[in-house]
């Protein structure tokens, strides 16, 4: 093209170092801006009387420009410049408002769906008893999940208290009223009970009379969990029950005394018993012959052979 300049040494006088802005000998191709533009017309310097030439600004037809200007309250540009773009923007105005409304609706729907999924997961995992505290940013509509959780928690507490109250007269009725020495406190039976209660799933041991004592004791020994245990005696005078201590463990001093008494009484009792070992009377068993077959010799032979 006519505006393309030949390659010249890059000697510029406008730099801060004068003519030595680039070293001499380094060539730089003068850039033609026409190569990068779609318009093939060459670039010309602006005319000297630029202020007297009437010109219109080129306004790009962007999508939401008119809506943004209306929202910001800016004054619209002159109508001849905005003819095409305002027509396009007026067509696009309704879908923009619709898109904003659907954006708000989708946000609320997504938040609601998230809360429902959280509630469903907590219900499955059994975490609803502790209640659900909403996030600070949640709206008042979503705080109903907190109210639902609290209501469920209170309902469960009330039903639990009712069942406990119903259970107490039933357990009181299950204890026979003709018991001479009844325990002053209702105790729940369990497998591993501590203190006064015995681990007998059968009848109450305090109701057994002395006539059938041996028969009932054998039956309780048969059905008790940890073998025969001494029966519980209740003190009728005091309100506290006597704790079961089992067999008293002897102290080491008592053990030494008992051993000394036993040695003094019968010294032969502490001697170890004699073991009757049959003596071999010179009979030696003949050595057993190996029952080896020729194929087994391959296993016993070292690998070097």
UniProtKB/Swiss-Prot annotation:
<feature type="modified residue" description="Phosphoserine">
    <location>
        <position position="183"/>
    </location>
</feature>
<feature type="compositionally biased region" description="Polar residues">
    <location>
        <begin position="191"/>
        <end position="210"/>
    </location>
</feature>
<feature type="region of interest" description="Disordered">
    <location>
        <begin position="37"/>
        <end position="56"/>
    </location>
</feature>
<feature type="modified residue" description="Phosphoserine">
    <location>
        <position position="182"/>
    </location>
</feature>
<dbReference type="GO" id="GO:0016491">
    <property type="term" value="F:oxidoreductase activity"/>
</dbReference>
<keyword id="KW-0597">Phosphoprotein</keyword>
<feature type="compositionally biased region" description="Polar residues">
    <location>
        <begin position="233"/>
        <end position="243"/>
    </location>
</feature>
<comment type="similarity">
    <text>Belongs to the P33MONOX family.</text>
</comment>
<dbReference type="Pfam" id="PF15302">
    <property type="entry name" value="P33MONOX"/>
</dbReference>
<feature type="region of interest" description="Disordered">
    <location>
        <begin position="159"/>
        <end position="305"/>
    </location>
</feature>
<keyword id="KW-0560">Oxidoreductase</keyword>
<dbReference type="InterPro" id="IPR026759">
    <property type="entry name" value="P33MONOX"/>
</dbReference>
<comment type="function">
    <text>Potential NADPH-dependent oxidoreductase. May be involved in the regulation of neuronal survival, differentiation and axonal outgrowth.</text>
</comment>
<keyword id="KW-0963">Cytoplasm</keyword>
<comment type="subunit">
    <text>Interacts with NELFB, NOL12 and PRNP.</text>
</comment>
<feature type="modified residue" description="Phosphothreonine">
    <location>
        <position position="175"/>
    </location>
</feature>
<keyword id="KW-0521">NADP</keyword>
<feature type="compositionally biased region" description="Low complexity">
    <location>
        <begin position="169"/>
        <end position="183"/>
    </location>
</feature>
<feature type="region of interest" description="Disordered">
    <location>
        <begin position="1"/>
        <end position="20"/>
    </location>
</feature>
<feature type="modified residue" description="Phosphothreonine">
    <location>
        <position position="44"/>
    </location>
</feature>
<feature type="short sequence motif" description="Flavin-containing monooxygenase motif">
    <location>
        <begin position="67"/>
        <end position="77"/>
    </location>
</feature>
<protein>
    <recommendedName>
        <fullName>Putative monooxygenase p33MONOX</fullName>
        <ecNumber>1.-.-.-</ecNumber>
    </recommendedName>
</protein>
<dbReference type="GO" id="GO:0005737">
    <property type="term" value="C:cytoplasm"/>
</dbReference>
